């Protein structure tokens, strides 16, 4: 079972949107929670996601180094170059999980999109390989297409993603 810890300003609606599930599904999974009285630190069950402790993979992102590191049971498997958000549209920092995958999303997203548990943010490919290594995105983590395809084939939905400055 996967739990989300409520952050300042979040509502059940915003949490449902972040995890791409319906509000009714979220309420059904949390029958003892009053949707109008959430508090910071409260644990909310997110239906449909596995317990993250059962997933041996983890992704660490360093915005300043423009690197995404894939770990397996705490050991580095591979380090990928990435592009991140520019000054006005910075990549959010914090702890997230991969909530879905969409091959061939089209346009600037390259050949793969993996949604993070923050609405409108994800890890994706690119139609502009020269952007990798720079701070040029609208906040997403951009990778070479071959790299994001390899990553998506390796990590399951529910994989933890830690993004640091």
Curated annotation (Swiss-Prot):
Pathway noted in the entry: Cell wall biogenesis; peptidoglycan biosynthesis
L,D-TPase catalytic domain: residues covered: 57-164
GO CC annotations, alphabetized: extracellular region; spore wall
Record-linked Pfam families: LysM (PF01476), YkuD (PF03734)
EC number: 2.-.-.-
InterPro entries the record matches: LD-transpeptidase (IPR050979), LD_TPept_cat_dom (IPR005490), LysM_dom (IPR018392), LysM_dom_sf (IPR036779), Transpep_catalytic_dom (IPR038063)
Active site: 124, 140
PROSITE patterns referenced in this protein's UniProt entry, alphabetically: LD_TPASE, LYSM
Signal peptide as annotated in the record: none
Location in the cell: Spore wall
Annotated GO biological process: cell wall organization; peptidoglycan-protein cross-linking; regulation of cell shape; sporulation resulting in formation of a cellular spore
Domain LysM: 2-46
Functional note: Probable enzyme that may play an important role in cell wall biology.
Domain writeup: LysM domains are thought to be involved in peptidoglycan binding.
Family: Belongs to the YkuD family.
Subunit structure, as described in the record: Monomer.
Protein name: Putative L,D-transpeptidase YkuD
């Amino acid at each position: 079972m996967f739990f989300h810890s409520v952050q300042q300003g979040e509502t059940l609606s915003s949490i449902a949107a972040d995890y791409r599930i319906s509000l009714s599904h979220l309420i059904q999974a949390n029958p003892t929670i009053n949707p109008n009285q959430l508090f910071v630190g409260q644990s909310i069950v997110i239906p449909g996601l596995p317990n993250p402790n059962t997933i041996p993979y983890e992704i660490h992102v360093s915005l300043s180094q423009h690197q995404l590191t894939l770990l397996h049971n705490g050991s580095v498997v591979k380090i990928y170059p990435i592009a991140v958000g520019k000054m006005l549209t910075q990549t959010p920092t914090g702890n997230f999980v991969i909530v879905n995958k969409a091959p061939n999303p089209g346009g600037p997203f390259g050949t793969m999109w993996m949604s993070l548990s923050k609405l409108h943010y994800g890890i994706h490919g690119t139609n502009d390989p020269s952007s990798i290594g720079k701070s040029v995105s609208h906040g997403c983590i951009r990778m070479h297409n071959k790299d994001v395809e390899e990553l998506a084939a390796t990590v399951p939905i529910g994989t933890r993603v830690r993004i640091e400055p």
